[in-house]
Amino acid sequence: MSTVGSSSEGRHSVRCFRHRNANTFLTYSKCPLEPEFIGEHLFRLTREYEPAYILVVRETHTDGTWHCHALLQCIKPCTTRDERYFDIDRYHGNIQSAKSTDKVREYILKDPKDKWEKGTYIPRKKSFVPPGKEPAEKKPTKDEVMREIMTHATSREEYLSLVQSSLPYDWATKLNYFEYSASRLFPDIAEPYTNPHPTTEYDLHCNETIEDWLKPNIYQVSPQAYKLLEPSCLSLEQAIADLEWLDDTTRMLQEKEREASTSAAQHGQVKHPGLEASDDTTTGKTISTGLHMMKKLSTMSLTTFPSSSVRAGNDSSAAKKTT
């Protein structure tokens, strides 16, 4: 029973093993065979799978014994269910799939004592090209396709048309994104503005003379400028006081002029033909004096106004005379 059981277990282990890969990594431990002998044997063994490259390297263990590594690359995947398929004489080969052929080849060649090589090595992610055939044309990536479209498209319509013909699936599922990118690459050109009301003659300009209103109302002199123009003014405070006095005097004369004009209009005074305004008339004096002073204040130089010190002396002498 045990024999039958053991034989059944052995058959079960053989049935469970399966190797199917185009790149095979083999290790023969404690194997003194020559690399060339192993390589030629593997080439004949896998002829039906069209071997493209075989590399066999012999190394020494730390105890001085030999062991061999082999990298086998075939055009067709090498398929077997026999775990002793790659055995050579009495030396059993450890079978592994070489998922990264670059790393396997680098590992095999780390410290070779003897090496045998046949065929053309196929780097990772590159298909094998048999001798006499040209490599297949590389298919451009989506990034390369879009870069080509953006470089050559000249309008929004042409851009969307090229995307539709080059990337139909992406155009059908992501059309809103392509429409947005088209609007950014080819924005609408703003039309030049046209005034609905064409320009006409200068009929809306103000005909008032601003200068006549500006001088009596917004005539301003800074204390610094007044101090420079008036030699008798020795300080900034004195200049401010003089300017305030001038402002008060001007306003007082303007008010008297308005009162005199209103009084004359209310009494209905009529000028006699040929008679000029006389200094004997009280109203005439006031109007004449007011107009004269206003013109004088608005046209005379600032240097004609007395400084505060002189004005104070005049005010005191006038008070004594009045007393």
Swiss-Prot record:
Recorded domain comment: There are 3 rolling circle replication (RCR) motifs. RCR-2 may be involved in metal coordination. RCR-3 is required for phosphodiester bond cleavage for initiation of RCR.
Enumerate the InterPro entries for this protein: CRESS_DNA_REP, Gemini_AL1_MSV, Gemini_AL1_REP, Gemini_AL1_REP_central
| One example of a Gene Ontology biological process annotation | DNA replication
Could you say which residues bind a divalent metal cation here?
E59, H67, H69, D111
Where's the motif RCR-3?
A: 107-110
Q: What positions belong to coiled-coil segments?
A: none
Does this entry carry the keyword Nucleotide-binding?
yes
Locus of motif LXCXE motif, interaction with host RBR1: 204-208
Protein origin, superkingdom: Viruses
Q: Which cofactor does it need?
A: Mg(2+); Mn(2+)
Query: Which intervals of the chain are annotated as region Oligomerization?
Result: 181-193
Q: Where does the record place it? A: Host nucleus; Host cytoplasm
- In the Enzyme Commission scheme, what number(s) does this protein have? 3.1.21.-
User: What name appears for this protein in its UniProt entry?
Assistant: Replication-associated protein A
This chain's source organism reads: Panicum streak virus (isolate Kenya)
Q: Which residues are responsible for catalysis?
A: Y107
What keywords tag this UniProt record?
Activator, Covalent protein-DNA linkage, DNA replication, DNA-binding, Endonuclease, G1/S host cell cycle checkpoint dysregulation by virus, Host cytoplasm, Host nucleus, Host-virus interaction, Hydrolase, Metal-binding, Modulation of host cell cycle by virus, Nuclease, Nucleotide-binding, Nucleotidyltransferase, Repressor, Transferase
Region entry Disordered, spans: 256-286
By sequence similarity, the record places it as follows: Belongs to the geminiviridae Rep protein family.
The subunit field of the Swiss-Prot or TrEMBL record says: Homooligomer. Interacts (via LXCXE domain) with host retinoblastoma-related protein 1 (RBR1), and may thereby deregulate the host cell cycle. Part of the C- and V-complexes which are RepA-Rep-DNA complexes involved in the c-sense and v-sense transcription.
